[in-house]
Amino acid sequence: MASYSMGDLKKGLKIELDGVPYKIVEYQHVKPGKGAAFVRVKIKSFVNGKVLEKTFHAGDKCESPNLVEKEMQYLYDDGEFCQFMDVESYEQVAISDEDIGEAKKWMIDGMMVQILFHNGKAIGVEVPQVVELKIVETQPNFKGDTQGSNKKPATLESGAVVQIPFHVLEGEVIRVDTVRGEYIERANK
């Protein structure tokens, strides 16, 4: 396994501390007036989704986790577990809703996602940063609604609710940023 020092840390890097895999979500290099520089990071656990703050000083080391990402197809939710299939080997993997976390609200049947394995066990799902989803329910438009930058709530086919501009209608397919949970634009379909 690779080892990282303080200078190697950056946003998006995956590290392992005490046997738990984390992803660095925020990174700040601090150089105080007196004393040695250090790095303050916020790390998110792949196992339980909790975000922790950690400080690394010069000489501190952390390990690279034994993580493997594999592209798989989301099949269905049986109520307790979500079922995924490797499209090459047809091997199926079941992951609990708890392990999937926030990614679940963006998933629809047939979608290709990245499954994260730690030491051979499926521990999480990463959906694409931008997904195209159909609007299944939203308020109708009234004359004058298209003026200004007002928004209305819309329920998507995955069950997620996002704010959309008034000119977008029910039945249309839109592009959504899954990280921020925001409407981007209408999809070109």
Swiss-Prot record:
InterPro entries: Elong-fact-P_C (IPR015365), NA-bd_OB-fold (IPR012340), Rib_uL2_dom2 (IPR014722), Transl_elong_fac_P/YeiP (IPR020599), Transl_elong_KOW-like (IPR013185), Transl_elong_P/YeiP_cen (IPR001059), Transl_elongation_fac_P (IPR011768), Translation_prot_SH3-like_sf (IPR008991). One of its GO terms (cellular component) is cytoplasm. Pfam families: EFP, EFP_N, Elong-fact-P_C. Keywords: Cytoplasm, Elongation factor, Protein biosynthesis. It is found in: Cytoplasm. It comes from the Bacteria. NCBIfam families: efp (TIGR00038), PRK00529.1 (NF001810). Involved in peptide bond synthesis. Stimulates efficient translation and peptide-bond synthesis on native or reconstituted 70S ribosomes in vitro. Probably functions indirectly by altering the affinity of the ribosome for aminoacyl-tRNA, thus increasing their reactivity as acceptors for peptidyl transferase. Belongs to the elongation factor P family. This is Elongation factor P. The gene is efp.
